[in-house]
């Protein structure tokens, strides 16, 4: 580009006069609709003299470094006043923010307009609250550092209709999802309630069936007993004599042994199984420990399952040698006639209570005590006497030692007390009150109680399982509390509350700020000039510094941007005009990179870097996401750097000649004095 500089020689007088005349400056907003390029900063003084510098913005400057040795009578830096005026001019440039895009400025009215509005009842100061200003929401205060200047600024967020609609749509979507989730949870809750109700109904029906089955069993058992009594009556009427009666008693006895009821058969099987378990425990110490753990309720589920295997094994084994079952009471046959002499003699010879024998310390046996089931039939073989006998024998065991059946089987009679060795490790199935009951079709008419010596273990009262039962192929080991002890209350489950740390309220964003976490338009105003607000550039690189409250922002200022924009509109108009079909989409201005066009005018640019500080940490995502993606910005900058031309700066002359530049130096000192007078009060001005 040709330099607009006159090469004609001038006198010293002309040079002095030219120093007083400021260079006309082209300002923003004064461009005409012409294609004349923006040459601000490139124009030379038309009336520059033969001085080694030229006057730009009332300041002496040159493209080359200053040479103060050419000055005959050089003034000091203080007397020249160039340095101080240059700082003032630079600060004014930053305050006017010519490197930023102007978004809003306060409108001024003359006196006539103000008087007219006052007559209409309108406050002129409120007119400025326009729609544009209402769209700007304050973000925070900060400090902008540019060059040698530190400028306090106030940041704003520009309200964006597109972001507002997107936020509204997102809130409605969340609300719908919440409603759907609430509805799904309600349906799931209703389904669980119906399922629970159905299970309760099934349980109730099953219980009714069991009751009916029990009644049928009782009726059937009663019918069998009646049939036997009728047969006995017929036999007594037909055959009267001692030989016949004795023969009939023998028949009845043999019949009673061979036709046990289901409850009695179950009792015999359980006694055999317990005897086999005791025999296995004597041979296997590991099984002995396992039995103790299961009885105390300390066995894990795996050990319980393993113990069930031993139970099934003991049930399938042959009874021990010389072992005979012992029924708690023999079948009782009610008769209307007096018992015969032979029956009285046989009853007198039978001992009412078996004689117990002390067990050896090393033997570990499981004891068989009978306890009548709840709600037993009056015709059953269990009586209060047998229950009291078993309780009495249990107390004798606790006080006088353990009683066990003879393992050698000399007498073959089952004893009432189960063994516990001196060390307290008993081969028991559970704590006192543990019973074995059948779960097959017949209801249980008898339960085997397995007493355990109190070893001082508090955990002995714990149940084997949550429901207090271990089922294994029709056999259930149930846990019952001792008589006289209160049932254990269930502990209420209280849901642990989540410990949520109270977030510092000062670090929370408002609802409006949360909308603009991405793609926010940031504006700012200088506190020294609150009448104008400017936009931060979108094509910029933002870098957060170590203190997390400061940011480094770099961008490129294009000086002939107006010329390039006019060229861009012309190219887009031609491209959209040459579209053959209407179906083809037009080229969008935002997607067209004019700097890559081969006929694009030469770009005149200057790189800029500023520092934003004192920004609260909570606004970090808003600030960092307010610019375009870094990759696209780097591509944009690389295109300008490759095809544009960077403007060179000028060097100021901080010293002037006392004679040759006396008028220029005097004017600079006067301007500086007037600027300082503005900071003094009216009283100080009067004193001067």
Swiss-Prot record:
User: Does the keyword Membrane feature in the UniProt annotation?
Assistant: no
Output compositional bias ranges, type Acidic residues: 33-46
> What are the BP-aspect GO terms?
endoplasmic reticulum organization
Segments passing through the bilayer: none
* Region annotation Disordered: where it falls in the sequence: 1-48, 174-252, 317-469, 483-504
Q: State one molecular function term (GO).
A: ATP-dependent H2AZ histone chaperone activity
The entry's function note states: Component of the SWR1 complex which mediates the ATP-dependent exchange of histone H2A for the H2A variant HZT1 leading to transcriptional regulation of selected genes by chromatin remodeling. Involved in chromosome stability.
| Name of the protein in question | SWR1-complex protein 3
